[in-house]
From Swiss-Prot:
<comment type="subunit">
    <text>Homodimer.</text>
</comment>
<dbReference type="InterPro" id="IPR050120">
    <property type="entry name" value="Adenine_PRTase"/>
</dbReference>
<keyword id="KW-0328">Glycosyltransferase</keyword>
<dbReference type="GO" id="GO:0003999">
    <property type="term" value="F:adenine phosphoribosyltransferase activity"/>
</dbReference>
<dbReference type="InterPro" id="IPR000836">
    <property type="entry name" value="PRibTrfase_dom"/>
</dbReference>
<comment type="similarity">
    <text>Belongs to the purine/pyrimidine phosphoribosyltransferase family.</text>
</comment>
<dbReference type="GO" id="GO:0044209">
    <property type="term" value="P:AMP salvage"/>
</dbReference>
<keyword id="KW-0808">Transferase</keyword>
<comment type="pathway">
    <text>Purine metabolism; AMP biosynthesis via salvage pathway; AMP from adenine: step 1/1.</text>
</comment>
<protein>
    <recommendedName>
        <fullName>Adenine phosphoribosyltransferase</fullName>
        <ecNumber>2.4.2.7</ecNumber>
    </recommendedName>
</protein>
<dbReference type="InterPro" id="IPR005764">
    <property type="entry name" value="Ade_phspho_trans"/>
</dbReference>
<keyword id="KW-0963">Cytoplasm</keyword>
<comment type="function">
    <text>Catalyzes a salvage reaction resulting in the formation of AMP, that is energically less costly than de novo synthesis.</text>
</comment>
<dbReference type="Pfam" id="PF00156">
    <property type="entry name" value="Pribosyltran"/>
</dbReference>
<dbReference type="GO" id="GO:0005829">
    <property type="term" value="C:cytosol"/>
</dbReference>
<dbReference type="InterPro" id="IPR029057">
    <property type="entry name" value="PRTase-like"/>
</dbReference>
<dbReference type="GO" id="GO:0006166">
    <property type="term" value="P:purine ribonucleoside salvage"/>
</dbReference>
Amino acid sequence: MTATAQQLEFLKNSIKSIHDYPKPGILFRDVTSLLEDPKAYALSIELLVERYKNAGITKVVGTEARGFLFGAPVALGLGVGFVPVRKPRKLPRETIAESYELEYGTDQLEIHVDAIKPGDKVLVVDDLLATGGTIEATVKLIRRLGGEVTDAAFIINLFDLGGEQRLAKQGITCYSLVPFPGH
C-alpha cells in the first residue's frame, strides 16, 4: 500500500504541537500523541514496512529512545533483527562509541560490536529528523562495523533544520511520513 494523502494527513493530525516546550519560542512536535492512537501508530508502522519490504534490509537500527518504538515493530514487519543504539553504558556487551555535537556540548552513542555483520543492509529508524546529528553518528557506528546503510526513515521531518541535507552528504536517503517546519 502506498501512502495516500488522506493517510498522511491522518498521521499529521495525530501529532500534537506544544508551544514553548521545552523552552520559550520552541514549537515541539509530540510524537507520543501518535503512539496513544493505535490506528495512527499501526498505520505509521505499516507504511514504513510497505516502503522497505522489498529493499533487502537485513537489520533495522533504532536510536534511543523513541527510535525503539518505531524501529522494533518495523523490524518485526520486515522479518529482520532489531539493533538498539543507546547512550553510553546502557548496553551490556562489548560496544563501540561515536561522539556527536549537541547545541551546547557533545554526546555519545554506542552499539554492540557483534550486532551488525559486514554486509548487513541496514535501515535506520527514528521518530524525528531535525539537524541529523544523532543519525549521522548512528550511521558512522554501523559503517564502522561493516554494515551498509543508505536509508533512514522517520515519522517526522523538521524539514527546515537541515537534517536531510546533512545526511544526503553521507549518502543517506531520508524518508519521512510527516513534514513540519522546525521553528
